[in-house]
Amino acid sequence: MAAKVDVKSLPACPAETTLTLISDKWKVLILRDLMPGTKRFGELKKSIGSVSQKVLTAQLRDMEQNGLVHREVFAEVPPRVEYSLTELGRSLKPILDAMWNWGEEFKARNA
C-alpha cells in the first residue's frame, strides 16, 4: 500500500503540486506507458528507452510512494514484478492527453 503523502509539505499552488508529482521526464513517460495497462519492469525499460535501471527503479518507487503506481510482486522463480496505475494515477489521463495534443499542435505549427 502506498504511503500517505504529507500534504503540508506540498506547494500551496495546485498546479505546482501536480508538477512536483510528475515533473520528471521519466515520470511522464512511465505514466504514458502504463495508461494502456500493466507492464513488467523490463517492458517499461524497453518502451521508455534510454533510462537507466537505477533511475527507472527510483522513479517507480517515488510514484508508488505518492500513490500513482501500484507494484505487485509475484512469488515465482524467477521473480516477477508488475506495475500498473492506481486510480489516482489514471486520473492524470486528461492531463497527459492535453500535453499530447499541445505537443502535436506545437510541432504542426513549427513544421
How should each PLM-predicted stretch be described?
Residues Q59:
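Residues within the DNA-recognition helix of helix-turn-helix
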